[in-house]
Amino acid sequence: MLNRGYLLKGETVEGAIERICSAAAQRLYKPELKEAFKEMVERGWMSLSSPVWANMGTERGLPISCFNVHVPDDIEGITHKLGEVIMQTKLGGGTSAYFGAMRERGSAVTDNGKSSGAVSFMRLFDTVMDTISQGGVRRGAFAAYLDIDHPDIEEFLSIKDIGHPIQNLFYGVCVPDYWMQDMIDGDINKRKIWAKVLESRQQKGLPYIFFTDNVNRNKPQVYKDMNLTINASNLCSEIMLPSTEDESFICCLSSMNLELYDEWKDTNAVKLAIFFLDAVLQEFIAKTEGNHYLKSANSFAKRHRALGLGVLGWHSYLQKNMIPFEGMQAKQLTTSIFSDIQEKASKASKDLAWIYGEPELLKGYGRRNTTLLAIAPTTSSSAILGQTSPGIEPFSSNYFKAGLSKGNFIRKNKYLRELLIQKGMDNEDTWRSIMLQHGSVQHLKQLTAEEKEVFKTFKEISQLEIIQQASIRQKYVDQSQSLNLNIPAELPVKDVNKLLIEAWKLGIKTLYYQRSQSVSKEMVTSLVTCKSCEG
């Protein structure tokens, strides 16, 4: 898996781990940490993000892949931000931008002309993605964010429609509380727009939804004190940081492997991970120093030092312990695990501040980093770690071809396989029947009801339950989580509407893609109910 684009020419996996961990230890002036970092990676406790694998400790590319720019309402500023995005993309970043500050189509501009509006400028960014390939590792990707009360919103929601000039961009809508409330209370115009959002998510999986007030109500204290607004997120909707015209947020990501939580929960693994990410940030700062187009990102990195340690392997951890994804036990574990990670990460940032000092923005706060946790999607990382489940998401199947950006791989759920071996059912016929049922085991008569619960797939799990679990987790995560929903096309739109309103009410900050895998009719109703509410 790693040979496909993440390693240097002729490099072995061991060589890459050596390169990365010694670079991290050097950045911290703590050569003694190299072995501890190596152990974390070799044991699979910490999963590195793709740009860290590809670029950390090398002369090429950047070890950070996540950027956002704030597009201002004047041509000079727009040109500069476009240049910034070109540079970020060329160096391997996934980029995003907030366009909400731009005036609407048709409004007056200084030379007596009329503005062509926010969406027309997005076409420039769309073209960049087509033109600039990222040193061969992966194609550029860009997400545009716009407020739902922006006058150009309807034009924006038709991006990616057949015949629309913009086809490469991903996009998200920023929705404030007042707007949601008006829409719920019956404002006709807002209902029309909301219906478009629901329809678009059902058909295209997009737009992402960014609940502006949920985000800003729960941002770190320093951002409240400095009056910094978080306007939009990144390409994967888990980053919650403020970009301005002068500063472009970047986020420094890697993840802890929850599948092995019981191995590392009583060690200093989380502390080491936070130290490691701070080192990655330091390398980013050094590599971008003096680069004209990365000045805003460099300034943000220095002043905020924002980190985003995430997790993967949550569903794997549950299955390993024969715990269903739905129900009280998984919710209680969510609380205990994430409060534990939060506490350790926070202490690590204090330790870093004590050793290396506080950055400019955090003088007097006793911390080295404005944020510490963010839960990214991790599809490739999960495969690198030997098929652990992605992020906080359930497995979408128990048996499938995994088509990742670096190729196709066949996989069987290893914990299910162990169970089938115990039952003398690990044979071609059983797996074939699972494949024909699209990766489900609900038809296997030899499994108990409890076992079937444990091996439910993403599309068979209540989406309300996924939202409730995410809202518990969100209390401990200072940024956000890449939260996908899997909603079958046949679910009535009023039920989908209820789910999204519930997500907003429960304080969810962002919703990522909406997938729609079909399930049987009986299944559909259970997708919007709550297991643990039934007692």
Model-derived segments and spans:
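Structural signal for hydrophobic packing residues in well-ordered secondary-structure cores
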Residues: 6, 20-28, 38-45, 83-90, ...
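Solvent-exposed alpha-helices and their adjacent loops that cap or buttress functional pockets
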Residues: 59-61, 88-91, 135-140, 201-203, ...
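Internal maturation/activation junctions in enzymes
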Residues: 272-298, 302, 306, 321-378, ...
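Hydrophobic alpha-helical scaffolding
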Residues: 6-10, 26-27, 31, 68-75, ...
